[in-house]
Amino acid sequence: MDVTDVIEPAEQLSLETAGCRNVSPVLNRVGDKWSVLIVMILADGPRRFNELKRHIDGISQRMLTLTLRGLERDGLVSRTVEPTVPPRVTYALTELGESLKEPVEALGRWAMAHIDCIRAAQQRFDARG
């Protein structure tokens, strides 16, 4: 017998709400536009900070720093400092970050396949005033 078979509906809703609450911060991180772009770039291999900044149009130095720190905190990106002068800092996907490549690529493919439909829907919505 499955545990959900013996849980009352109100309890089930409570468990689902708790699950959403637990997953929400993770989805906020991996669903953030800058995080997605960083994961896509690092999927091709390790990069230095300025390389990432050059590849991501419109991101400020502060936002790149904050996003990388968040990804590092969540275990998705590693930061390696080489003891050179000046210090060389390299960012790479961790094993956990590597596991995010496929879903991010799938999301990108979906977006590219449906961009025309989405733009048309936006235009219809905006035309309503």
Describe these PLM feature segments.
Residues 2-8, 101-129:
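Amphipathic alpha-helical dimerization/coiled-coil segments
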Residues 3-7, 15, 93:
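Loop-helix junctions at membrane interfaces
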Residues 13, 17-63, 90, 98:
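N-terminal helix-turn-helix DNA-binding core of bacterial DNA-binding proteins
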Residues 46, 56, 68, 97, ...:
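Short amphipathic alpha-helical/adjacent loop interface patches that line ligand
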Residues 64, 68-71:
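Basic amphipathic alpha-helical segments that dock to polyanions
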Residues 83-107:
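Basic, amphipathic "hinge/linker" alpha-helix immediately C-terminal to the N-terminal HTH DNA-binding motif
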